[in-house]
Amino acid sequence: MRGLSAVVRVLCVAALAVGVFAAAVLLAGTAGNAKAAGYESLMVPSNAMGRDIPVAFMAGGPHAVYLLDAFNAALDVSNWVTAGNAMTTLGGRGISVVAPAGGAYSMYTNWENDGSKQWDTFLSSELPDWLATKRGLAPDGHAAVGASQGGYAALALAAFHPDRFGFAGSLSGFVYPSSTNYNGAILAGLQQFGGIDGNGMWGAPQLGRWKWHDPYVHASLLAQNNTRVWVYSPMTMGGDIDAMIGQAVASMGSSREFYQQYRSVGGHNGHFDFSGGGDNGWGAWAPQLAAMSGDIVGAIR
């Protein structure tokens, strides 16, 4: 993997300035099918995907953190709710929590050749608009945090929809997908673990459209908008193989290359953790969510 060994040697934990948004008025209580930790199990319609999407929702304030699952995302309840313990971690912090399910092997993007995978439209438009209408949330000013494929999506959503998302957290994310060092790994993992031809996403990588969707290529947007960024990628390939589609090395390399790119374009509002502790799995991702919770609250509440 050309150039990867040099990149992986980059060890840094950079914590940079964080902007604090004005405090917001708390939401009144919401009605619904309450479950553990006080969250609701919603079915949110998606015209783009032609079906209703299961969403775990916990009311806490007008701004929310959207939690995006790994490649082996659960069908009905997000792994953030179960393995990630997110509702307990974020409860009582003055923010709402939004955790969609059913996005396995999708990268949470709009697929060119699969109408059932139009996740960017759902996450950036349909879901926030529905929550604004039905649950009284603010239409804009939210956070996106994801693990594995969700880490890619969190940075992409914040880069391309800055009004919607002012905070992006990537945990073991695949954040430079257009690189020839990594796109083959993503395609191989999608085929092996999901039985899916990833060329249906943005076409074959050599056609060039992968760059249109790449947060590495568009890191300047995150820098220009002063988006708060949190990136975690441990110095190990261990962890949840299924969640990482067996390609942890691509996550490691791309996260470190993203750091270099982000700094080169003037980014200065990021926290990057490339330490030796932890792994690429829920045993590390859940504590990372707790560690970044103060940053999330400071950025969106």
Swiss-Prot record:
Cellular component, GO, one term: extracellular region
Location of the protein in the cell: Secreted
GO molecular function: acyltransferase activity, transferring groups other than amino-acyl groups
Signal peptide: 1-36
InterPro entries linked to this entry: AB_hydrolase_fold, Esterase-like, Mycobacterial_A85_antigen
Record Pfam families: Esterase
Domain of life: Bacteria
Membrane-spanning residues: none
Keywords on record: Acyltransferase, Secreted, Signal, Transferase
Family: Belongs to the mycobacterial A85 antigen family.
Function: May have a role in host tissue attachment, whereby ligands may include the serum protein fibronectin and small sugars.
Record text on subunit structure and interactions: Homodimer.
Official protein name in the record: MPT51 antigen
Originating organism: Mycobacterium leprae (strain TN)
Species lineage: Bacteria, Bacillati, Actinomycetota, Actinomycetes, Mycobacteriales
Originating gene: mpt51
